[in-house]
Amino acid sequence: MHVFFPLLFRPSPVLFIACAYIYIDIYIHCTRCTVVNITMSTNRVPNLDPDLNLNKEIWDLYSSAQKILPDSNRILNLSWRLHNRTSFHRINRIMQHSNSIMDFSASPFASGVNAAGPGNNDLDDTDTDNQQFFLSDMNLNGSSVFENVFDDDDDDDDVETHSIVHSDLLNDMDSASQRASHNASGFPNFLDTSCSSSFDDHFIFTNNLPFLNNNSINNNHSHNSSHNNNSPSIANNTNANTNTNTSASTNTNSPLLRRNPSPSIVKPGSRRNSSVRKKKPALKKIKSSTSVQSSATPPSNTSSNPDIKCSNCTTSTTPLWRKDPKGLPLCNACGLFLKLHGVTRPLSLKTDIIKKRQRSSTKINNNITPPPSSSLNPGAAGKKKNYTASVAASKRKNSLNIVAPLKSQDIPIPKIASPSIPQYLRSNTRHHLSSSVPIEAETFSSFRPDMNMTMNMNLHNASTSSFNNEAFWKPLDSAIDHHSGDTNPNSNMNTTPNGNLSLDWLNLNL
């Protein structure tokens, strides 16, 4: 109190600074003690005994300093890895015990012990005590042992070891069922205790693993019950084996086993699936081959079953049997008639001869020779296709009977162009045109012949037979001068006394 007394009555900055230094020294001393304790605890060599629970010690060591340490996540990951390493050491020890027990059970010494030793019921108490102890230890440590806190590089290795351990555990369960049948006649006490301890180690490991289902744990209890039951019958052994098989089949639902399943569980199913997948293309090939054979073989003219008769026409020869709406058999003709017309086929249309359809006319067959049909020739299909296409084209052309239109190249053109005849000179009767209509020379002199007009007139008024007539294309230059009119009265060539042109040379078939 004498240190704080001057502060209350005579405050001064010197005393205030001194008190501050004292408080700082006390704080540094306290923190130094905590750091020393931490360093001493870290300098201790950890005991890697697999029976010790190191994750609890590491957790207690770093839980207080987790918030102030920069690499707290890495330390947490390291703690989980150390714990997993110890758990795998424990698993290896369990597997060694189980293998030694299996070797002993297969030896002739074990059969002699089973034949001589009396029954022993001391396993019940040890099993129940060990189970209660391990269950209490599980409640303290927690069941979330294998969480996803591993590094990404080690995930595949961990999954592989889990699947291997799981398959080994299932094999150990089978050996435990065999061991139960041996215990029916009796084992020595030291062997029974070792068997129970190793079997209980299996029990705690299966409870701690999250990738094992509850079905496997229940099956493990059934193994314990068969282990404790001392009936000498062989039926218990078979029941235990069936229980292990059911546990092996139910454990395939776990996610880790889906990623990397054990070979003892998934191989039969995978073989079955592969065989089914291989059978599918084989079935497709069989179907395709049968379809090719059915298409290659022509349909028979008669039915395979002569006892069947048509319910309408009572015939027994038909290329195809059909059915009416009531389910009665119909021949091909009656069935098609009913399908197309909706009524039954009259008996007056019945014929005993099956007519074949004429797919091409006789003219086309005479003109075009079909190629030789050979099923062995690979190019026969292409030739047959070309043949049918040519037959169809020629048949279509003959049925339409189309006359191609006349082109300008097909029309005979005169060497000397002649003018077209005016409308008032045309007549429907054959006669000599005289001086009934006066025509001046200027009409023809100013007129220029147009080839298009000439062809149009000829096509419109004359038939095609008149094109070959010499009088139709008689030249007009002898009577008409296209350049200048002849007004000389002394020239009487093709003129009348009145001075009109005489058109007697026009012998047109108009």
From Swiss-Prot:
The keyword Zinc applies. Coiled coil: none annotated. Keywords: DNA-binding, Metal-binding, Nucleus, Phosphoprotein, Transcription, Transcription regulation, Zinc, Zinc-finger. SUPFAM superfamilies: Glucocorticoid receptor-like (DNA-binding domain). CDD domains: ZnF_GATA. A zinc finger (GATA-type) spans 310-334. GO terms for molecular function: DNA-binding transcription activator activity, RNA polymerase II-specific; DNA-binding transcription factor activity, RNA polymerase II-specific; RNA polymerase II cis-regulatory region sequence-specific DNA binding; sequence-specific DNA binding; zinc ion binding. The keyword Ligase does not apply. It is found in: Nucleus. GO terms for cellular component: cytoplasm; nucleus. Residues 274-287 have a biased composition (Basic residues). Present with 1180 molecules/cell in log phase SD medium. PANTHER family: BOX A-BINDING FACTOR-RELATED, TRANSCRIPTION FACTOR GATA FAMILY MEMBER. This is Transcriptional regulatory protein GAT1. It comes from Saccharomyces cerevisiae (strain ATCC 204508 / S288c) (Baker's yeast). The gene is GAT1.
